[in-house]
Regions:
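Short basic helix-loop element that most often maps to the first helix and adjoining turn
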Residues: 4-22
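Residues in the helix-turn-helix
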Residues: 18, 29, 58
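Recognition helix of helix-turn-helix/homeodomain-like DNA-binding domains
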Residues: 25-38
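Short, basic-rich loop-to-helix N-cap that marks the start of a DNA-contacting helix
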Residues: 37-50
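Short, charged recognition helix plus adjacent turn
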Residues: 50, 60-66
Length: 66
């Protein structure tokens, strides 16, 4: 699914490792989500939204599949 994770991360000057540590996941998971190879679980999507202060649908777009 399309997402804005890479853009939001870059706006904060965070590396993939920084974001992974903040979310409690592996860097490989962040890479896979950013490349749209992996859709995050609902709990992880909520954590991402909370971390960036946005709604899930503002970050992840299930209507616009990759």
């Amino acid at each position: 699914m399309k997402n804005r994770l890479r853009v939001l991360r870059a706006e904060r000057d965070w590396t993939q490792e920084d974001l992974a540590n903040r979310l409690g996941v592996s860097r490989q998971a962040i890479i896979a989500i950013e490349k749209e190879k992996y859709d995050p679980s609902l709990p992880l999507a909520f954590k991402v939204a909370q971390l960036f202060g946005k709604r899930i649908e503002d970050i992840f777009d299930p209507e616009n599949e990759g």
